[in-house]
């Protein structure tokens, strides 16, 4: 194909959910279409959650243990009052920092912020990394005697997310 096509397209999660809903419907109505438009289910979250679940060791305690419990029963609906949605997004934010932060920090803080601001690229790359389990981004270059695995990075990201949420909202998870 001789023409340039930008890589800046939206994550397909929203259209995947809309298509899923439309394919399951018979006899459309205004109310049904409203429910499709107001649907807050994230196929991206549903796709990523099983990878997060696999990192639970059973040795977690406190809010970290509760976080895994919330994530295990979460249906991927991004309700404003959902503790699991908050934990998921805090985990994803920390995952991005833990995957890319060590390399991009070498260029300066502005580079990390600029890259993480490109949500479309970041989500697409995370999907690729999770599908293959491989990427040079996974290894933390600041730990020369250890090559991190994707599960280690995910586990660290969940733990970092809980620390971040406790610092922001306190240790009582019901206040999150």
For each of these PLM feature ranges, what is it?
Residues 37-176:
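Acidic, low-complexity N-terminal propeptides/linkers enriched in Ser/Thr/Asp/Gly that mediate export
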Residues 1-66:
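Structured mid-domain segments that build the active-site/substrate or prosthetic-cofactor binding neighborhood
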């Amino acid at each position: 194909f001789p023409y340039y096509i930008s890589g800046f397209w939206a994550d397909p999660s929203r259209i995947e959910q809309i298509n899923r809903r439309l394919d399951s419907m018979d006899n459309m109505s205004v109310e049904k279409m409203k429910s499709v438009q107001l649907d807050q289910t994230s196929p991206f979250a549903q796709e990523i959650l099983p990878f997060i679940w696999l990192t639970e060791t059973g040795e977690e305690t406190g809010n970290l243990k509760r976080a895994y419990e919330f994530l295990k029963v979460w249906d991927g609906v991004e309700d404003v009052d959902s503790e699991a949605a908050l934990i998921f997004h805090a985990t994803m934010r920390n995952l991005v920092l833990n995957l890319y932060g060590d390399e991009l920090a070498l260029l300066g803080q502005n580079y990390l912020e600029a890259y993480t601001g490109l949500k479309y690229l970041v989500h697409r790359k995370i999907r690729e990394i999770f599908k293959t389990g491989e990427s040079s981004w996974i290894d933390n270059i600041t730990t020369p005697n250890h090559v991190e695995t994707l599960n280690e990075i995910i586990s660290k990201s969940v733990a970092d997310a809980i620390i971040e949420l406790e610092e922001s909202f306190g240790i009582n998870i019901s206040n999150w």
